[in-house]
Amino acid sequence: QQGNIIMPTKAKADASTNVLQIQPLKQGRVKLRMMGSTPLYFNSMSSKAMRDLLIGGGKKTAAQKQHIKHNPEKEFNDSVYKKPHGETLLCFPAPGVKGAMATAALETEGIKKASVQRLIFLPQTHVQIWGKPQLKIDIVRSSDMNRTPDMRTRAYLPRWCAEVDIAYVQPTLSAHAIVSLLTNAGAIVGIGDFRQEKGRGSFGTFQVLSEDSMGSFQKDWDELMLEDRDVQQEALDNPEFADEQTAELMQYMQEERSRRDITLVA
């Protein structure tokens, strides 16, 4: 008390009220099957392209310029992602599948792309891919100003399937939400080159299934399970051509190699 004025007293803070109660997020997990609806183009960067990025491509000598520009067999092998062990030799980067789901969120009501990137996690680094690769040569346009035409050789899977393990944050997301999001990704985005997302192509699209909901797809799934590591390795070592145009181009390539007396070294 000061004079006739009564000074208010300060209440002591209760230490217990300052303790934050933080509950850990719960995580759900679901394993789903991806059954290819359209063929898959692999699009791994070649080892030569990676070396050129690492140390620079450099200018070609006159002798180097005499060599044939493309080596389709090597480009075919370089175009795939490979696993050192596992049921399959071929695989696809898990971030590519997650990216497809994030892109699909742009067209999916109730979820944002940023939320998918934060709340969904794929434990594996690569997703196993079943299916027999074929060698395919296509005409493409370079990214230079003149859009110069070039030829690109890639692994092409007419039929394919995959199995993906997806973890997600609960209760923000549910297993049903993950299935819906991956289904949308399979329909409007796809994976690999010339995928649906890019507009021009419609490749790499897929349907989403689970082990207990295969229905009429079970027969196709069982057949594709036989196209595993051994079959894929044989297909890379002794490639089959995907179409008549590729077969004609490869025949011309062999004739040109013979004319120039070029022998490929394995």
Language model region names:
Residues 2-266:
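RNA-interacting cores
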